[in-house]
Amino acid sequence: MDALKSAGRAIIRSPSIAKQSWGGGKHKKLPENWTDTRETLLEGMLFHLKYLGMTLVEQPKGEELSATAVKRIVATAKASGKKLQKVLLKVSPRGIILYDSASNQLIENVSIYRISYCTADKMHDKVFAYIAQSQQNETLECHAFLCTKRKMAQAVTLTVAQAFKVAFEFWQVSRENKDKREKSGSDGEGASSSQSDGSSSITSLKASASANLLDFEDCTKAFDVLNASDNHIEDLFRQNSTNENNNIVWELDDGLDEAFARLAESRTNPQVLDIGLTANDLQSEECLSPTSWDKLELNPAEADELFMF
């Protein structure tokens, strides 16, 4: 079974994803079964890409919309004649964090709640792109990245979609707790009861985590290729050494909460991030192979085909 096809079905069919505690630690390899490691996605999955650029768009989602935006970005990148910037893209339920590969300097941190669409472009099939609402002026921006191969662009897209499902569950809990606090008002007893209810619900969600992260039947097959015998895989999934993500209760500011609610209204299904991938797109004899994801340099022959995607 094609790995990407299985992963795609899992994103569509998987049950509600329970909340987990955020962890840190040293680098480590993935286990034989990726679905056994809850922290893998929660702590962030890393992808080595090349940044093509950004352009403004008028709508939060749409295949034709994103295709036009990507075409414009690629044309601008070609015209500039500049070497593409190598970047490290970290995907987690908190969002997309972009680092410069050479300096490790933070370029951008986009909350998952501001992302309205992502896709592996049809025309330029090595390009991954996402649309997000700007934090500064609330305009909609389409950002595009060049991957080493088409399967990698699809893998990044599916990873962002899966991260969104986790984030949506966090958002629901945050909203529920916020509503309880508002109802309890300034009454001490009410506040205590609200806190107890919140803790109880989170404990219950954590208890069911191992069973609900992904659809086991499909995703066990989909991620069998991500196993500890692959010497390259540990370089792709580096855990954050800080404890910045240890708190599983996310407090959203009113602006972000409103932005997410507004973007949710534009989705086909508010609980699922719209992606420009279909079952037909994922049908291929080529399996998702992470061994080439960490390929940073193009050989001379490939360099001439930099924009021939």
Swiss-Prot record:
Q: Alphabetically list the UniProt keywords.
A: Atherosclerosis, Cholesterol metabolism, Cytoplasm, Endocytosis, Hyperlipidemia, Lipid metabolism, Steroid metabolism, Sterol metabolism
Entry's Gene Ontology cellular component terms: early endosome
The UniProt entry annotates the motif [DE]-X(1,2)-F-X-X-[FL]-X-X-X-R motif at: 258-267
The sequence motif named Clathrin box is recorded at 213-217
Using the UniProt annotation, give all residue ranges assigned to the region (Disordered): 179-201
Q: In which tissues is it expressed?
A: Expressed at high level during oogenesis and embryogenesis. Found at low level in the adult liver and spleen. Found at very low level in testis and heart. Not found in the oocyte vegetal cortex.
Q: Where in the cell is it found?
A: Cytoplasm
Q: Where is the PID domain?
A: 41-195
Q: What is its main location?
A: cytoplasm
Stretches with biased composition (Low complexity):
189-201
- What residue spans carry the region label AP-2 complex binding? 250-277
Pfam families this protein is in?
PID
Quaternary structure and interacting proteins, as annotated? Interacts (via PID domain) with ldlr (via NPXY motif). Binds to soluble clathrin trimers and to the adapter protein complex 2 (AP-2, beta 2 subunit). Binds to phosphoinositides, which regulate clathrin bud assembly at the cell surface. Interacts with the VLDL receptor (vldlr). Interacts with the vitellogenin receptor.
**What's the domain remark here?**
The [DE]-X(1,2)-F-X-X-[FL]-X-X-X-R motif mediates interaction the AP-2 complex subunit AP2B1.
Q: What role does this protein play?
A: Adapter protein (clathrin-associated sorting protein (CLASP)) required for efficient endocytosis of the LDL receptor (LDLR). Also involved in the vitellogenin receptor mediated endocytosis of nutrients during oogenesis.
Q: Kindly provide the name given to this protein in its UniProt entry.
A: Low density lipoprotein receptor adapter protein 1-B
Q: What is the lineage of its organism?
A: Eukaryota, Metazoa, Chordata, Craniata, Vertebrata
